[in-house]
C-alpha cells in the first residue's frame, strides 16, 4: 500500500527536476548488483547475504518511477488565474511540460478507469493502494481498465485533448479519497531512490 508524507505545495526544488540524475543513480545501483566487487572491496561485506541485501535495495529503487523523462512544473497545485476565464480558480492538479512523451506508471498498481470527457480529455486513472493517480489530456491511451501495471509501464502518450491550451500532462492525486498536491509523488520517488542509493553505498 502506497504511503506518502503530505506537503503543502510544490517547491522550487520540484519545478524542474532532471530524472537524468535518477537514471544515473539507477545505473549505479544496477552496477552494484553485478559482481559486487566494488561494494565488497569498500566494506568487506560479501557472499550470499550481501547479494540478497543488494537485490532488495535495487528492487525497492525500481519500485517507483517518475511519470516523464523530465519533470518541469508549468502550473502547480492550488489557486491560479484560469487560462480560459482569467478568473481566480482552484487548480486541483499539477501540470508538467511534455511533448509527445510516454506517460509512465509511478508505482505498481491497477488501471481502474480510462475514458474521455470535455474537461480531462483522454485520461487514465491508476490505483496504488490508498492512492489514486489520474493522467489527463492524453493524445493516446495505451492500457485498458483492469490492467495491472508495474513502475515504468507506459499507460499513455501526452497530448492536448479536452480543456487544454496546449500540450502538457495534468496529474491529479487522491490520497485516502482526498485531493492532495501531486508534488508528494515526486517527493516520494526522490526520497525512495535517494535512500536506496545511500544504502547501496553502505553495503
Residue ranges: model-predicted function:
Residues 10-122, 151, 203:
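Surface-exposed, glycine-biased beta-strand/turn segments
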Residues 76, 114-115, 141, 158-161:
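Residue-level recognition of beta-strand microenvironments
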Residues 96, 123-126, 150-162:
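Short hydrophobic beta/alpha edge segments that flank linear recognition/processing sites
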Residues 101-102, 116-117, 160-163, 174:
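Short polar/acidic secondary-structure junctions
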Residues 104-105, 114, 128-152:
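Short histidine-centered loop motifs in beta-beta connectors
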Residues 119-125, 167-169:
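Short aromatic-glycine-enriched beta-strand elements
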Residues 144, 151, 172-203:
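Acidic, glycine-rich catalytic/binding loops that coordinate metals and/or anionic ligands
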Amino acid at each position: 500500500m502506497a504511503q506518502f508524507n503530505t506537503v503543502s505545495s510544490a517547491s522550487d526544488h520540484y519545478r524542474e527536476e532532471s530524472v537524468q540524475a535518477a537514471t544515473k543513480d539507477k545505473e549505479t545501483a544496477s552496477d552494484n548488483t553485478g559482481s559486487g566487487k566494488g561494494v565488497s572491496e569498500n566494506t568487506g561485506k560479501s557472499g550470499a547475504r550481501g547479494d540478497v541485501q543488494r537485490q532488495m535495495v535495487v528492487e525497492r529503487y525500481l519500485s517507483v518511477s517518475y511519470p516523464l523523462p523530465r519533470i518541469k512544473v508549468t502550473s502547480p497545485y492550488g489557486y491560479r488565474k484560469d487560462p480560459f476565464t482569467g478568473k481566480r480558480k482552484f487548480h486541483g492538479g499539477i501540470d508538467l511540460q511534455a511533448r509527445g512523451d510516454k506517460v509512465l506508471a509511478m508505482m505498481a498498481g491497477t488501471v481502474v478507469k480510462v475514458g474521455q470527457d470535455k474537461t480531462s480529455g483522454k485520461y487514465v486513472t491508476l490505483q496504488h493502494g490508498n492512492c489514486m493517480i489520474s493522467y489527463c489530456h492524453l493524445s493516446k491511451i495505451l492500457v485498458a481498465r483492469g490492467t495491472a501495471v508495474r513502475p515504468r509501464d507506459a499507460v499513455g502518450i501526452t497530448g492536448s485533448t479536452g480543456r487544454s491550451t496546449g500540450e502538457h500532462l495534468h496529474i491529479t492525486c487522491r490520497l485516502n479519497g482526498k485531493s492532495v498536491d501531486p508534488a508528494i509523488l515526486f517527493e516520494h520517488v526522490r526520497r525512495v531512490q535517494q535512500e536506496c542509493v545511500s544504502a547501496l553505498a553502505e553495503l
